[in-house]
Amino acid sequence: MNPRRKSRLTIILFVLLGVTIASSLVLYALRQNIDLFYTPSEVISGKNDDPDTIPEVGQRIRVGGMVVEGTVKRDPNSLKVSFNVNDIGPEITVEYEGILPDLFREGQGIVAQGVLKEPKLLEATEVLAKHDENYVPPDLSEKMEQVHKPMGISNQDMQGESDRDRLDKAVNSVEEGKK
């Protein structure tokens, strides 16, 4: 190999090494700004029930779920609010200091972004409320569909009408027919 080719190869290798190092540093810096989305069940048991995917305490995450009825507690001396959020399973507690969105209320869907302070405690820096009464965060609705369909829960069950309700209606109509 002549000296000219050798110097070109050396320059190319140093440029590639520099680009690789710069790319690695950029990706490492961005890693801290990426907020992964979890449901409350995934915060506790991991994505797809894999314990290796449970978020670590101190990690920035986004949690989407429904505000549990009767769990909203407001500090009378400040803007601190705490409430529980669940999807179809366990609950986690969210603490937030600030003004909540106008559409925030119990029983409604929210997405909270913040830092996981304890395995079941999220210190939120931002709380986003749903848009209307039919809104459910997309990831949460997918998870609910995955859980409800295999269990044999029908759309009527999801709307509050169970097999027992349908059976009671049928029995009542038969009894009325006998009269």
Swiss-Prot record:
One of its GO terms (molecular function) is metal ion binding. The chain crosses the membrane at residues 9-29. GO terms for cellular component: plasma membrane. Pfam families: CcmE. Keywords: Cell inner membrane, Cell membrane, Cytochrome c-type biogenesis, Heme, Iron, Membrane, Metal-binding, Signal-anchor, Transmembrane, Transmembrane helix. Coiled coil: none annotated. Residues 1-8 are cytoplasmic. Belongs to the CcmE/CycJ family. This is Cytochrome c-type biogenesis protein CcmE. The lineage of its organism: Bacteria, Pseudomonadati, Pseudomonadota, Gammaproteobacteria, Pasteurellales. The gene is ccmE.
